[in-house]
């Protein structure tokens, strides 16, 4: 499940995971209010797993709220604890070097899914970014980041 910019990275991850015979339900929230809880509950019931991707920090995040509600209302549907991929709880870095590990990317999503599925996949091997700098989403991006 994702929202905002991280959905682009999630789409990349899902495409790479499909090549490894791992099928994912990707829910793009598009809005965080109202949240389509029935869609989320159905996905958790179907897959037994939940990874929530958030472009906000971990503490006080929408991801935390979604995981909390799933744990309260659908905990018996989960095969394992849910996972949250969000930004760390500190200010966003402004130097190129510090941004390398700050923002979540498709590779991080693949690694989280791999761990959840007890598979030995490496996101960096499955995603070929070529010569695109780590802080540029893709070749079509023309603005500052």
Q: In which residue ranges do the predicted regions lie?
A:
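Thiamine diphosphate
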Residues: 1-145
């Amino acid at each position: 499940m994702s929202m905002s910019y991280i959905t682009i990275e999630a789409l990349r991850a899902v495409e790479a995971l499909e090549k490894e015979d791992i099928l994912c339900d990707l829910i793009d929230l598009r809005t965080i209010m109202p949240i389509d809880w029935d869609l989320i509950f159905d996905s958790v019931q179907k897959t037994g797993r939940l990874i929530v991707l958030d472009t906000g920090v971990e503490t006080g995040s929408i991801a935390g709220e979604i995981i909390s509600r799933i744990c309260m209302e659908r905990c018996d549907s989960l095969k394992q604890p849910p996972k949250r991929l969000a930004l760390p709880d500190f200010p966003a870095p402004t130097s190129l070097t510090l941004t390398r590990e700050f923002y979540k990317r498709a590779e991080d999503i693949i690694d989280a899914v791999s761990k959840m599925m007890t598979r030995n996949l490496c996101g960096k091997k499955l995603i070929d970014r070529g010569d695109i700098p780590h802080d540029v989403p893709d070749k079509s991006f023309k603005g500052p980041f």
